[in-house]
Amino acid sequence: MMLRGNLKQVRIEKNPARLRALESAVGESEPAAAAAMALALAGEPAPPAPAPPEDHPDEEMGFTIDIKSFLKPGEKTYTQRCRLFVGNLPTDITEEDFKRLFERYGEPSEVFINRDRGFGFIRLESRTLAEIAKAELDGTILKSRPLRIRFATHGAALTVKNLSPVVSNELLEQAFSQFGPVEKAVVVVDDRGRATGKGFVEFAAKPPARKALERCGDGAFLLTTTPRPVIVEPMEQFDDEDGLPEKLMQKTQQYHKEREQPPRFAQPGTFEFEYASRWKALDEMEKQQREQVDRNIREAKEKLEAEMEAARHEHQLMLMRQDLMRRQEELRRLEELRNQELQKRKQIQLRHEEEHRRREEEMIRHREQEELRRQQEGFKPNYMENREQEMRMGDMGPRGAINMGDAFSPAPAGNQGPPPMMGMNMNNRATIPGPPMGPGPAMGPEGAANMGTPMMPDNGAVHNDRFPQGPPSQMGSPMGSRTGSETPQAPMSGVGPVSGGPGGFGRGSQGGNFEGPNKRRRY
């Protein structure tokens, strides 16, 4: 039964010779090997198979294979590794004939023919298909000329040396992808799987490979943290698969001369043995010198790595010091900015305080001026009344100065003498009654004890806390609560009722006990 899709129908031809050739060329998995053998068997023209009857179109003529089965997991298609060189082509071959020669191995992507020199190139889909086509078509007679098929030289491959042990295939491919598309990147390892420090990179075209070679040669391309640059060189191409078969040897005179004797061991003491020994000694010397050179190079590399580690440590310390100095400089600059900001704030605060103090002083000065103005307006008439009161108190009796300082006391007579200081009679401070000791009226023993302090409200009126307003009392009334040691004096002649405000001593009878508001309380 025929399968559809990416499948092709092939003819089956059992040829033991081609079967052995295919088994030696293809060492892949069992399904791939079986499919490869089936493709190889279809190389030579086979006897025409009987055509199936027309009434049975589904009868099988062979078996079908899937081209995708020849792709390895992750393998890219149509790479440089799938490119074949075909030599010894007829000069009259056409491109259609050349394609028809490889049509059984998939659709090619590149076909080039140089008819003058008799060679061409073709690129197949996978490496496995290219190996099958090479194994099948190499040596095939085409127009009486045997074809010579080899894998084409990879002109976009580079050798990478001085790799770090931590570099992998993926890292190598990622590093060189910046120059162009990479088809394959491999780090070479030994039989134990340890990295040898070498690898190769295959680009899809020559321009990216040339660019990578120039850039890495002019500069230092680092793959890891270690400052260890990679060394990039063009890859040396070797054919280690086919080698040099006998059929390709040129039969020259030197060839026939060297082939006169078969392979053998030289016998000791002979001419052959002597020079063979000298050749071996030269090879041994070359080996020793190479080992010495390798040893010197290895020691130099170790020394360089040690110096590099020390220099890296010193460099890190220098970077840390520079970073510390930079941070200190930044902190100092921030501190300066902070100090400047604080200074500005302090100046602003001082200006505010100065302005506030100036405003307070202005308010205090304004308040003082206002108080002074009020005093000048309110105390001027009261001062005249106090003067009149003091002048009137000069003609009063011994107890006349009791109510001095009262703003509502009657003013003294105009014919009296000068008033005593602050309205007090300094000559009447004795507790024993007697004649007055000097000019001026006599003052009672308690005259100065009951002096009030005039109080002036905002309206200019004078009030006395100790002499509240009340009914008028008599000026010379005797005080019944006085002690017996005091002898009340007679009221002064010629002194009538005292005129004044309602808060002065009362008018009227002088007899009886004095019950005025200035009477001392007894506790």
Curated annotation (Swiss-Prot):
The molecular function terms in GO held by this entry are:
RNA binding
Q: Which positions are tagged coiled coil?
A: 283-377
Task: Establish whether keyword Repeat is in the entry.
Answer: yes
Phenotype when changing W279A: Abolishes interaction with NONO and localization in nuclear paraspeckles
Region labeled Sufficient for paraspeckles localization — which residues?
125-358
Which residues are reported to carry the modification N-acetylmethionine?
Answer: M1
The segments labelled Disordered in the record are 460-523
The protein depicted here goes by the name: Paraspeckle component 1
Annotated Gene Ontology cellular components are: cytoplasm; fibrillar center; nuclear matrix; nuclear speck; nucleoplasm; nucleus; paraspeckles
Outcome recorded upon mutating F121A: Abolishes accumulation in paraspeckles, but not in perinucleolar caps
Q: Where is this region: Sufficient for perinucleolar caps localization and interaction with NONO?
A: 231-358
CDD domains per the UniProt record, alphabetical: NOPS_PSPC1, RRM1_PSP1, RRM2_PSP1
One matching Pfam family, short form?
NOPS
Q: Which organism is it from?
A: Homo sapiens
Q: Name one GO biological process term.
A: regulation of circadian rhythm
Q: What role does this protein play?
A: RNA-binding protein required for the formation of nuclear paraspeckles. Binds to poly(A), poly(G) and poly(U) RNA homopolymers. Regulates, cooperatively with NONO and SFPQ, androgen receptor-mediated gene transcription activity in Sertoli cell line. Regulates the circadian clock by repressing the transcriptional activator activity of the CLOCK-BMAL1 heterodimer.
* Tissue-level expression: Expressed in pancreas, kidney, skeletal muscle, liver, lung, placenta, brain and heart.
Task: Mark out the compositionally biased spans (Gly residues).
Answer: 497-514
Query: Which SUPFAM superfamilies does this one have?
Result: RNA-binding domain, RBD
